């Protein structure tokens, strides 16, 4: 599915429902049409582009099987925009989707409907996260918190192309039951001559259950503490030494531990075969009792400060922006969940603490950052760190086989 076209106007916009959706006494303002309104042009272009490509894909029959060319294919569009939505979209931009048929197939295998995916990315602007990856990587979540949008480098895009066929085959063989990132789309956006690459994945954390503490674990102990700057954040990302120094454990019980480690071992062996390393286990902890207390405080505050009328029908803009009108969308919460409860088909990385756990918790655990190959740079970094810290030190830049073995051992020790 390769196309290269120039358009003077943007794609037709779809009407939205004008119904009001309430969440915790907040009101939404519905847009009659998709305006792709965002705080910066790059996000408006992302919303426009995903809306356009999903609409285009809906007209392409689903093939019986993917062909080798699908793993090299792309669709791209150049827009000279002088008429449509000038307040929100740049006058000129380009949008490229990589391997559209492959990512559509992956979304299907991960149980994600294209319409839901489109709605999540395009209904309201993505939200900036205070998380920041290496080399200034930027993270956003969709307004409903279902998906994570991450800026990546052109080298990451090249590595994704290198592994995509084997990754897809692995997902087919494990029926989507994996701790690996669920890659759902990869795009290049060009605004004012600047190219930005973005990858969309399923959110490891829940759209509904608050994460109270999080860790990025590699199984290495050299220089693996959160910085003072990181610790000052509302939700810092702690690291291996922080985890160990706190005496932290994840209380999942024997059976859940066995199942989790089997899945982890299979996933990590796959990464070692691809000569990939430097990945992490992202861990989020939801404290059920604390969440209940916070919920009560929110409700008490909401009663004290009922939403003020804005003079146009009593609607207020809420932090989620435009509401969904699809009954299956997560913000409508069609099912009731008690404290610490979740839908395992949605929160696929979630695991409850064992009943013998000292605290009632929900853990979210997944492998992240799998686009680092063991290349010449990594070999050089390993040599330098070995000289500095000694051959026996638990440095992070070891070879992929050593890395996977150490990673598995560390994760086995933190689960109980």
From Swiss-Prot:
ATP binds at residues 202-204, 214. It is found in: Endoplasmic reticulum membrane; Cell membrane; Nucleus; Cytoplasm. GO terms for molecular function: 1-phosphatidylinositol-4-phosphate 5-kinase activity; 1-phosphatidylinositol-5-phosphate 4-kinase activity; ATP binding; GTP binding; protein homodimerization activity. SMART domains: PIPKc. It catalyses: a 1,2-diacyl-sn-glycero-3-phospho-(1D-myo-inositol-5-phosphate) + ATP = a 1,2-diacyl-sn-glycero-3-phospho-(1D-myo-inositol-4,5-bisphosphate) + ADP + H(+); 1,2-dihexadecanoyl-sn-glycero-3-phospho-(1D-myo-inositol-5-phosphate) + ATP = 1,2-dihexadecanoyl-sn-glycero-3-phospho-(1D-myo-inositol-4,5-bisphosphate) + ADP + H(+); 1,2-dihexadecanoyl-sn-glycero-3-phospho-(1D-myo-inositol-5-phosphate) + GTP = 1,2-dihexadecanoyl-sn-glycero-3-phospho-(1D-myo-inositol-4,5-bisphosphate) + GDP + H(+). Its EC number is 2.7.1.149. PROSITE patterns: PIPK (PS51455). The modification Phosphoserine is found at residues 19, 326. The modification Phosphothreonine is found at residues 8, 322. GO terms for biological process: 1-phosphatidyl-1D-myo-inositol 4,5-bisphosphate biosynthetic process; autophagosome-lysosome fusion; cell surface receptor signaling pathway; negative regulation of insulin receptor signaling pathway; phosphatidylinositol phosphate biosynthetic process; positive regulation of autophagosome assembly; regulation of autophagy. Its main location: endoplasmic reticulum. Residues 38-415 form the PIPK domain. Residues 64-70 are annotated as: Required for interaction with PIP5K1A. Homodimer. Binds TNFRSF1A. Interacts with PIP4K2A; the interaction suppresses ubiquitination by the SPOP/CUL3 complex. Participates in the biosynthesis of phosphatidylinositol 4,5-bisphosphate. Preferentially utilizes GTP, rather than ATP, for PI(5)P phosphorylation and its activity reflects changes in direct proportion to the physiological GTP concentration. Its GTP-sensing activity is critical for metabolic adaptation. PIP4Ks negatively regulate insulin signaling through a catalytic-independent mechanism. They interact with PIP5Ks and suppress PIP5K-mediated PtdIns(4,5)P2 synthesis and insulin-dependent conversion to PtdIns(3,4,5)P3. This is Phosphatidylinositol 5-phosphate 4-kinase type-2 beta.
């Amino acid at each position: 599915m390769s196309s290269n076209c120039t358009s003077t106007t943007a794609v037709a916009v779809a009407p939205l429902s004008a119904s009001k959706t309430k969440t915790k006494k907040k009101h939404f303002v519905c847009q009659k049409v998709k305006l792709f309104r965002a705080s910066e042009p790059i996000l408006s272009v992302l919303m426009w582009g995903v809306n356009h490509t999903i609409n285009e894909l809906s007209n392409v029959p689903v093939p019986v099987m993917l062909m080798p060319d699908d793993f090299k294919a792309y669709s791209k569009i150049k827009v000279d925009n002088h008429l449509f939505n000038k307040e929100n979209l740049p006058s000129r931009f380009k949008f490229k989707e990589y391997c559209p048929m492959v990512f559509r197939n992956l979304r299907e295998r991960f149980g994600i409907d294209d319409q839901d995916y489109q709605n999540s990315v395009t209904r309201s602007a993505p939200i900036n996260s205070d998380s920041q990856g290496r080399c200034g990587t930027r993270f956003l979540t969709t307004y409903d918190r279902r998906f994570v949008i991450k800026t990546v480098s052109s080298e990451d895009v090249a590595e994704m192309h290198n592994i995509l066929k084997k990754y897809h085959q692995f997902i087919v063989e494990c029926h989507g039951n994996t701790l690996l990132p669920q890659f759902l789309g990869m795009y290049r956006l060009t605004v004012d001559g600047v190219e930005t690459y973005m990858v969309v994945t399923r959110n490891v954390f829940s759209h509904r259950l608050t994460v109270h503490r999080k860790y990025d674990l590699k199984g290495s102990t050299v220089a693996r503490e959160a910085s003072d700057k990181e610790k000052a954040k509302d939700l810092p990302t702690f690291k291996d030494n922080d985890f160990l120094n706190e005496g932290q454990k994840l209380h999942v019980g024997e059976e859940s531990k066995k199942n989790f480690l089997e899945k982890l071992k299979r996933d990590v062996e796959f990464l070692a075969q691809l000569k990939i390393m430097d990945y992490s286990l992202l861990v989020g902890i939801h404290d059920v009792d604390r969440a209940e207390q916070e919920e009560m405080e929110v409700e008490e505050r909401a009663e004290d400060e009922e939403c003020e009328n804005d003079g146009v029908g009593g609607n207020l803009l809420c932090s989620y922006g435009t509401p969904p009108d699809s009954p299956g969308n997560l913000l409508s919460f069609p099912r009731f969940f008690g404290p610490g409860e979740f839908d395992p088909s949605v929160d696929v990385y979630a695991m409850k603490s064992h009943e013998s756990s000292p605290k009632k918790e929900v853990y979210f655990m997944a492998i992240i950052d799998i686009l680092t190959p063991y290349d010449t740079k990594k070999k050089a970094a390993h040599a330098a760190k070995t000289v500095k810290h000694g051959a026996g030190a638990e440095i992070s830049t070891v070879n992929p086989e050593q890395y996977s073995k150490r990673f598995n051992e560390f994760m086995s020790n933190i689960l109980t």
